[in-house]
């Protein structure tokens, strides 16, 4: 812990952390991926966001219990090492970094698509390349610069979503509808096109692959514990605000969108938010919303690079990543991890140059696997921590999980169910395969390199003289 105080700078305030949690959770999954989820489930996608949101809140409370009890950078990777063993910590830490890289690939891809709204003739990879260099540079600055940027970008998103919800209600009241469309905007759109659950329970279940992707990154609150000024006060406040945010930013937003515009006409060419307002003939709103979804993508990329970098820093401190990852700049930023993330994102530039348009669902479903795996490990770690504690220690917890042990158990069952969803539907089976290969590679890497290295380190530190005392 002492080493931690000398290393990363505690430069993030309550304001920064609250908005970072928002920034990481409101991004490409909502502004772009929601179109795929709507096509799968129809208006019933609202139920999917409510159910998924409840499970995510339990993950956040489990993480919050551990982060308040022991705030460290690289948080849940280190917690897993402590309570489930070093291999579990290694797998969790690297899978989180993998999750952030894949989510980032989705975000930079979406950024290129959004820019195509204004510049349809410019190749998408050009925009992707530019944003990778810009965000990478910003993340090399002082952590406070990062926090400030995240605050203002998130504030813009929140303001725009609130304005869009109010505007949507206005459209419903005054009955504006798109050119050539005889169906006026209104609540009837939620059941007039095949009913509330047009694709049946199967469509609702299929949508979880994209819905859970939308929540990915919200666990960054735990990562910030090592750089929060007052973690025991700040983190509970940030986590307890999660349910309200899910209701407002996902459920209410999509409710308004599907009420003002027939859901079968919501396509995946660009953001559905921009498309709907453009088709309703409100061009200025479409332009403003495109600025907002671009800022949302930038904000999410920003959070992802921060989170993965801090996790790799924590792994390096435990000897589970190259030592260079623990090197700090004069600003107290783990610069090598930022460079590695930037290099990985250049792979996104290549992908956007080479691959077809329908790759977003594949990237999103791979990210869903990594995200849900991380959440499952967080839940298991919290259960292991509780089992290792005495009744007195449990009574002293400052931010305990509610409805223990039933709520965490229900969340664990739900996460396993999402893996089943990925494996069942043909469009997402590749994600389960990629995820399984990734986990196997990590187990092999741990057994071949990390474990022997840890054993060597233990031998070096062993002093025979001590054993004769």
Curated annotation (Swiss-Prot):
GO molecular function, one term: symporter activity
PROSITE patterns attached to this UniProt entry: AMINO_ACID_PERMEASE_1 (PS00218)
Result of knocking out the encoding gene: The mutant grows normally on urocanate but shows delayed growth on histidine. The deletion mutant grows normally on minimal medium with glucose and ammonia and on minimal medium with proline as a sole carbon and nitrogen source, but not when histidine is the sole source of carbon and nitrogen. The deletion mutant is not compromised in its ability to colonize sugar beet seedlings.
Top-level lineage group: Bacteria
Topological category with respect to the lipid bilayer: Multi-pass membrane protein
Keyword Cell membrane: yes
Protein induction: By histidine. In the plant environment, low levels of transcriptional activity are detected in the phyllosphere, rhizosphere and in plant extract, suggesting that histidine is present and available in this environment and can be used as a source of carbon and/or nitrogen by the bacteria.
PANTHER family in the record: AROMATIC AMINO ACID TRANSPORT PROTEIN AROP, GABA PERMEASE
Functional summary from the UniProt entry: Major high-affinity histidine transporter. Binds and catalyzes the uptake of histidine into the cell. Functions as an histidine:proton symporter with high specificity for histidine. Required for histidine utilization, but not for competitive colonization of sugar beet seedlings.
Family to which the UniProt record says this protein belongs: Belongs to the amino acid-polyamine-organocation (APC) superfamily. Amino acid transporter (AAT) (TC 2.A.3.1) family.
Protein name per UniProt: L-histidine transporter HutT
Source species taxonomy: Bacteria, Pseudomonadati, Pseudomonadota, Gammaproteobacteria, Pseudomonadales
């Amino acid at each position: 812990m002492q080493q931690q105080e000398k290393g990363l700078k505690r430069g993030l305030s309550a304001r920064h952390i609250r908005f970072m949690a928002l920034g990481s959770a409101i991004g490409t999954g909502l502004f772009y991926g929601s179109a795929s989820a709507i096509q799968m489930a129809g208006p019933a996608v609202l139920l999917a966001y409510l159910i998924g949101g409840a499970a995510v809140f339990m993950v956040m409370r489990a993480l919050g219990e551990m982060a308040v009890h022991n705030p460290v950078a690289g948080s849940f990777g280190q917690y897993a090492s402590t309570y489930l063993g070093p291999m579990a910590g290694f797998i969790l830490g690297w899978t989180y970094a993998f999750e952030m890289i894949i989510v980032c690939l989705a975000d930079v891809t979406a950024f290129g698509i959004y820019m195509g709204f204004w510049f349809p003739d410019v190749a998408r990879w050009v925009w992707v390349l530019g944003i990778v260099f810009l965000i990478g540079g910003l993340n090399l600055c002082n952590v406070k610069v990062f926090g400030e940027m995240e605050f203002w970008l998130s504030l813009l998103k929140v303001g725009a979503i609130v304005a869009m919800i109010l505007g949507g209600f206005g459209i419903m009241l005054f009955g504006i509808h798109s050119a050539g469309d005889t169906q006026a905007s209104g609540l009837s759109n939620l059941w007039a096109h095949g009913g509330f659950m047009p694709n049946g329970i199967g469509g609702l279940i299929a949508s979880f692959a994209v819905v859970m992707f939308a929540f990915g990154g919200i666990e960054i609150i735990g990562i910030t514990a090592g750089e929060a000024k007052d973690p025991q006060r700040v983190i509970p406040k940030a986590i307890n605000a999660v349910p309200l945010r899910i209701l407002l930013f996902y459920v209410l937003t999509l409710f308004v969108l599907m009420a003002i515009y027939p859901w079968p006409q919501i396509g995946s060419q660009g953001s559905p938010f921009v498309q709907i307002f453009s088709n309703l003939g409100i061009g200025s709103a479409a332009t403003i919303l495109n600025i907002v979804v671009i800022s949302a993508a930038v904000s999410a990329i920003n959070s992802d690079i921060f989170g993965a970098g801090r996790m790799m820093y924590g792994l390096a401190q435990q000897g589970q990543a190259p030592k260079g990852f623990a090197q700090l700049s004069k600003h107290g930023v783990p610069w090598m991890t930022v460079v590695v993330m930037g290099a990985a994102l250049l792979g996104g530039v290549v992908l956007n140059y080479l691959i077809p348009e329908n790759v977003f669902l594949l990237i999103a479903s791979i990210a869903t696997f990594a995200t849900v795996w991380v959440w499952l490990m967080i839940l298991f770690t919290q259960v292991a921590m509780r089992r290792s504690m005495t009744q007195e220690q449990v009574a002293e917890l400052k931010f305990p999980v509610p409805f223990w042990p039933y709520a965490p158990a229900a969340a664990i069952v739900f996460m396993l169910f999402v893996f089943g969803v990925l494996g069942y539907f043909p469009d997402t089976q590749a994600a389960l395969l990629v995820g399984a290969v990734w986990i196997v590679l990590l187990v092999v890497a741990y057994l071949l390199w990390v474990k022997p290295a840890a054993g060597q380190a233990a031998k070096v530190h062993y002093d025979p003289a001590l054993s004769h005392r």
